[in-house]
Amino acid sequence: MYPFKMNPQEYCKQKTKESHSSFLSAFIFLKKEKKNALIALYAFCREVDDIADECKDNKIGKNKLNWWRSEINRLYNKNPQHPVTIALEPYISKYNLNKLYFIEIIDGMEMDLIFNRYKNFKQLQLYCYRVASTVGILSAHIFGFKDNKTLTYAHNLGIALQLTNIIRDLGEDAKRGRIYVPLDELKKLNISESEILKNIKDKKIKDLVVNQTKRAQYFYKLAINNLSNLDKKNQKPGLIMANIYYVLLSKIIKDRPENILNQKTLLTKYRKLQIALLTFFNYEWIK
């Protein structure tokens, strides 16, 4: 067993606080039990994502991810060793959390170890499904739903959120040698990989960002169109995330998108909380 001294739930809270993520703004209206389940789920995502981000030796990275695959098996055999999985254990059966989604998340992180380019959107969409849609579907189970179409909503929302991350982090990822935008789409705009990696500022970069933003907006709208009125109340935290990221997309387009490789557009904590409150009272950005 890992020699952790911190209480498992406190460990998960600390892990999520370190990330400074927008997800925390979405949790503020949740009851304690659901909030703790979401925090444990997100802490798991942080653990495996940190391996993909920080491990420079792919072999070591794969070994660490394999440890997590084994740990998920131990979790479902009621013998978890890590504080994150110990914190998750009470919620597995309570919220009917499917083991395969956790394995898919790990598989997505392994893609980050193996690939730093994606040939086309089909490849990228698989990556987005594994690292984001799976999390959305698990979250939807925790929030609760009555209509199975809500899982389609969660799937598409995950794609939309991850595409937004990719647009926002285009310059940051380029500095790490990563290009998530499909290469065939760069080629159509006559943008070379080296131009992305060198952080050029150009109108064709603006065109690229506009095109990628339109695709993300499509998936947000596809998600919302699949969310049953029966489930809007329970799925409010996901809607908060959707609105925060949708507003972020709009800000990216307003903030000189041709310069996205040299600047990272962010929303203030106050703005995120404002969006969360407005969403709670049923204000809609995505129509």
Q: Where do the model's predicted regions map?
A:
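Catalytic cores of Mg2+-dependent Asp-rich isoprenoid enzymes
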Residues: M1-Q162, I167, G171-K287
